[in-house]
Amino acid sequence: MAAHILSGRPVVESLHARIQQVLARRAPHQGPPTLTVLLPNDPSAQAYARAIRKQFTTLSLNYRTEEIDDTLDESRFAILLKRLAEDESVTGILALQPLPKGVSRRSLARLMPPTKDVDGVSFEQQGRLAIGSPWIAPSTPLGGLILLQHYGIEVAGRHAVVIGRSPVVGRPLALLLLARDATVTICHRRTPDLAKLTRQADLLFVAAGQPHLVKPDMVAPGAVVIDFGVSVRDGRLIGDVDPAVAEVASALTPVPGGTGPVTTAVLALNLLRLAGLLEENDLFPGAP
């Protein structure tokens, strides 16, 4: 039996409705929150920025860009972030990848002002997530779990296998899963016999950045598979999971149209948190 396809569209519609309810309750003197995107000269980043702009326009949220070039060094990057941190009209800041060559991810984590960190990259936000008290969680992994919640797929008590350990998806995803009472295994490029572990998963999350890495024989019958991968092959978007996995899994996110749109909607939710319009414990809207 073919897997149930976990489309991101109804999840986005539900999140948009939640966001519009929150915005409708804000005080009369409060304007809409404003996101500033640090935009490199990179086609993938620019495509993502357009997707953000499209959703934010639909939601009547303010959106700005600051173009950054590859020659920007750490000192000038620090000046830019300091200026945005002091700008009262800026609610949140998002630094799109790739970063300038002179700016490391560690530098970004150190320099990003935590109170305007819309994607949970700062040391403070990462630390809060690590101790199980997140305020702003990275939008991609959080979006994946909100998607599961939307479709009524339980996380607690299940074995979740995560392929990928990046600081923006795999690692924070593992911490979020632990906070939701899953039993978590993390796999990466040095993991021996990857398929042996993936076949043990009730929930398989794939964020490896390798097109069609996961084949049907790597998935347990009835498993739920969440694909965070996005690559371009022959002019079309493909994920880290071979579409043939749909013949084995019970549920599977598509690429495109799965986790990607949900990620963007979660950025909007995070912006509302930074604006003080959502409670700290409202990490999973609608969750018990």
From Swiss-Prot:
Query: Known catalysed reaction(s)?
Result: (6R)-5,10-methylene-5,6,7,8-tetrahydrofolate + NADP(+) = (6R)-5,10-methenyltetrahydrofolate + NADPH; (6R)-5,10-methenyltetrahydrofolate + H2O = (6R)-10-formyltetrahydrofolate + H(+)
Q: Name one GO molecular function term.
A: methylenetetrahydrofolate dehydrogenase (NADP+) activity
Q: What is its EC number?
A: 1.5.1.5, 3.5.4.9
Q: Which UniProt keywords apply?
A: Amino-acid biosynthesis, Histidine biosynthesis, Hydrolase, Methionine biosynthesis, Multifunctional enzyme, NADP, One-carbon metabolism, Oxidoreductase, Purine biosynthesis
Residues holding NADP(+): 164-166, 230
**What processes in GO biological process is this protein linked to?**
L-histidine biosynthetic process; methionine biosynthetic process; purine nucleotide biosynthetic process; tetrahydrofolate interconversion
Sorted alphabetically, the Gene Ontology cellular component annotations on this record are:
cytosol
One Pfam family, please name it: THF_DHG_CYH_C
Pathway participation: One-carbon metabolism; tetrahydrofolate interconversion
InterPro entries per the record? Answer: Aminoacid_DH-like_N_sf, NAD(P)-bd_dom_sf, THF_DH/CycHdrlase, THF_DH/CycHdrlase_cat_dom, THF_DH/CycHdrlase_NAD-bd_dom
Q: Does the keyword RNA-binding apply?
A: no
Gene3D superfamilies attached to this UniProt entry: Leucine Dehydrogenase, chain A, domain 1 (3.40.50.10860), NAD(P)-binding Rossmann-like Domain (3.40.50.720)
- Database matches in HAMAP family: THF_DHG_CYH
- Subunit notes for this chain? Homodimer.
**Stated family:** Belongs to the tetrahydrofolate dehydrogenase/cyclohydrolase family.
**What function does this protein fulfil?**
Catalyzes the oxidation of 5,10-methylenetetrahydrofolate to 5,10-methenyltetrahydrofolate and then the hydrolysis of 5,10-methenyltetrahydrofolate to 10-formyltetrahydrofolate.
Protein name according to UniProt:
Bifunctional protein FolD
Q: Which organism is it from?
A: Thermomicrobium roseum (strain ATCC 27502 / DSM 5159 / P-2)
Q: Per UniProt, what is the name of the gene that codes for the protein in this document?
A: folD
